[in-house]
Curated annotation (Swiss-Prot):
HAMAP family: FabV_reductase. PANTHER family: ENOYL-[ACYL-CARRIER-PROTEIN] REDUCTASE [NADH] (PTHR37480:SF1). Substrate binds at residue 225. It is an enzyme of class 1 (oxidoreductase). Belongs to the TER reductase family. This is Enoyl-[acyl-carrier-protein] reductase [NADH]. Monomer. GO terms for biological process: fatty acid biosynthetic process. Coiled coil: none annotated. It comes from Shewanella sp. (strain W3-18-1).
């Protein structure tokens, strides 16, 4: 079939398998060009490995460190008449390229919050790898089914305490609007912590540890975003921030546990990037369009892959073997360039000046839109979007019901 982009709200409901493969290829090429990470991990589990930072982590491990990787994700395959999710095609492409280089690659399509997912991964590790020396936790799910009760909990992207009103961009109509978001209830805050906090990360490490499949020097990392006062009301000081603070709590507990055998647990605070997750957060698209333009001008721009390669090579797996630089809360800070005073001051000054008319001139809004559509495999140079493609893409994936 011929597949064209169809956008509804802040998601694109169609995806292009060839475009998604090209995205993965581009990240692999970047990683290979940067060179091998000398003392990188060799057996890596990535929970949430199909897009964004999780996918880049799997690529950095495999193509930057020659690691065997197991990827866990929850995606929909395509059929003969309907495209699957971008994450399905990304994972299929990763698997194809990894196997072509003789790298071990196993993928599990399942609910990562479930007990079954953890048991299946443990079984695979025991059978094929013996143990793992890195666990990347990169889930971005709006809902979580509690593994014991089966209850479904939903998160809320809301401020705390008071209604939040700010200048934002309507990405469907490409115009500047006033966005208003009502505050979260106490229950919504608690639910957001349950879905997006550190509980499931702890459950993964507990299950892997009790099964005896964590190597002595195993490192684990989970991803977070803090931002600045421009986005704090909706993010760090909102319900989502409470969940990310719970991730910090979990990191401390896990680090105490893993450091006893030479391992470590850290939260890595990353920069804002265009992902399906960030596009859903009010004001983030406008902020990203602003900050990207300034960072590009300063030669500091990074996408997911650049960030993760830097985290591996300059933080967790340094050539001198030294411990990574961390902040006072033991976090790895990869948002250091974004948070530079000159970059943030530029955004603060610009925010009140942006109108629908000058949006594309003052910010990188056009580039934001292009990067957004690229997530789904569209708008990529060299791909013939009028050509017939098969949306049904098979690969070596274990399906758990």
């Amino acid at each position: 079939m011929i597949i064209k982009p169809k956008i509804r709200g802040f998601i694109c409901t169609t995806t292009h398998p060839v475009g998604c493969e090209a995205n993965v290829q581009e990240q692999i090429t970047f990683t290979k060009n940067k060179g091998k990470i000398a003392n990188g991990p060799k057996k890596v589990l990535v929970v949430g490995s199909s897009s964004g930072y999780g996918l880049s982590s799997r690529i950095a491990a495999a193509f930057g460190c020659d690691a065997a990787t197991i990827g866990v994700f929850f995606e929909k395959p395509g059929t003969e008449t309907k495209p699957g999710t971008a994450g399905w095609y990304n994972s299929a492409a990763f698997d194809k390229f990894a196997k072509a280089e003789g790298l071990y690659s196993k993928s599990i399509n399942c609910d990562a919050f479930s007990h079954e997912a953890k048991q299946k991964v443990i079984e695979l590790i025991k059978q094929d790898l013996g143990e793992i020396d890195m666990v990347v936790y990169s889930l971005a799910s709006p809902v979580r089914r509690l593994p014991d009760s089966g209850e479904v909990i939903r998160s809320a992207l809301k401020p705390i305490g008071e209604t939040y009103t700010a200048t934002a961009v309507d990405t469907n109509k490409d115009c500047i609007i006033e966005a208003t978001v009502e505050p979260a209830t106490e229950q919504e805050i608690a639910d957001t912590v349950t879905v997006m906090g550190g509980q499931d990360w702890e459950l993964w490490i507990k299950a892997l540890s009790e099964a005896g499949v964590l190597a002595n020097n195993c490192k684990t990392v989970a991803y977070s975003y803090i931002g600045t006062e421009l986005t704090w009301p909706i993010y760090w000081h909102g319900a989502l921030g409470k969940a990310k603070m719970d991730l910090d709590r979990a990191a401390k507990a896990l680090n105490d546990q893993l450091s006893a055998t030479g391992g470590s647990a850290n939260v890595a605070v990353l920069k804002s990037v265009v992902t399906q997750a960030s596009s859903a957060i009010p004001v983030m698209p406008l902020y990203i369009a602003m900050v990207f333009k300034k960072m590009r001008q300063e030669g500091l721009h990074e996408g997911c892959m650049e960030q993760i390669y830097r985290m591996f090579s300059e933080r967790l797996y340094r050539t001198d073997g030294a411990k990574p630089e961390t902040d006072s809360d033991n976090r790895l800070r990869l948002d250091d360039w974004e948070l530079r005073d000159d970059i943030q001051q530029h955004c603060r000054d610009l925010w009140p000046q942006v109108t629908t008319e000058n949006l594309s001139e003052l910010t990188d809004y056009r580039e934001y839109k292009a990067e957004f559509i690229k997530l789904f495999g569209f708008g990529i140079e060299g791909i013939d979007y009028d050509a017939d493609v098969n949306p049904y893409v098979e690969f070596d994936v274990i399906e758990l019901q």
